[in-house]
Regions:
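Helix-coil boundary and interhelical linker segments in multi-pass alpha-helical membrane proteins
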Residues: 18-30, 80-90
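Membrane-proximal cytosolic segments adjacent to transmembrane helices
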Residues: 1-7, 100-137
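A cytosolic-side transmembrane-helix exit/cap motif
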Residues: 49-58, 109-117
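Hydrophobic alpha-helical transmembrane segments and immediately flanking/interface helices
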Residues: 82-112
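Juxtamembrane helix-capping/reentrant segments at transmembrane boundaries
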Residues: 51-72
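Alpha-helical transmembrane segments of multi-pass membrane proteins
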Residues: 33-44, 69-77, 97-105
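Loop-to-helix transition at the N-terminal end of transmembrane alpha-helices
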Residues: 28-42, 58-63
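Alpha-helical phosphate/pyrophosphate-handling elements in metalloenzyme active cores
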Residues: 8-22
């Protein structure tokens, strides 16, 4: 039984080490992105529950999108290390983009759930929503 737990620990250590390398280490930006992604997913589920539209298919699609965010961060990190050679400009830009994107989604979810949102932020959200609707059409 002890060998089994040692194997499990070895697997988790290996996966954790690889993820740390792939994502460029666990710094404050990555922690912030993880927090925004998790909170956005939770508030999205809360919105689906309040609308009575909770679906495992939609939830799985949301998880796939969140995983893709971290894959893109990893790709940006690889480009920084292997192509550019130093720094983390691309990784940082990708993380900032997705933090802001998740933040907008989080505010939309909060507004949908009835949480009061400052008027200035509502105006910006409406402009962003109108812009994304035009791009889809």
């Amino acid at each position: 039984m002890k060998e089994f737990w040692n194997t499990i620990q070895l697997i988790f250590a290996g996966v954790g080490g690889w993820l740390g390398y792939f994502l460029g280490g666990c710094d404050g930006l990555l922690y912030a992105l993880i927090a925004f992604v998790v909170i956005d997913y939770i508030t999205g589920v809360m919105c689906a529950i309040s609308n009575h539209t909770l679906s495992s298919e939609v939830g799985f699609k949301g998880i796939c999108r969140k995983v893709l965010i971290f894959l893109l961060v990893g790709i940006a990190n690889i480009l920084d290390i292997q192509v550019i050679g130093s720094g983390s400009a691309l990784r940082t830009a990708v993380i900032f983009f997705y933090i802001s994107n998740e933040g907008v989604s989080l505010l939309e979810n909060a507004a949908h759930l009835g949480l009061p949102i400052p008027e200035k932020i509502k105006v910006v959200l409406e402009q962003l929503h109108d812009r994304s609707t035009k791009e889809e059409n």
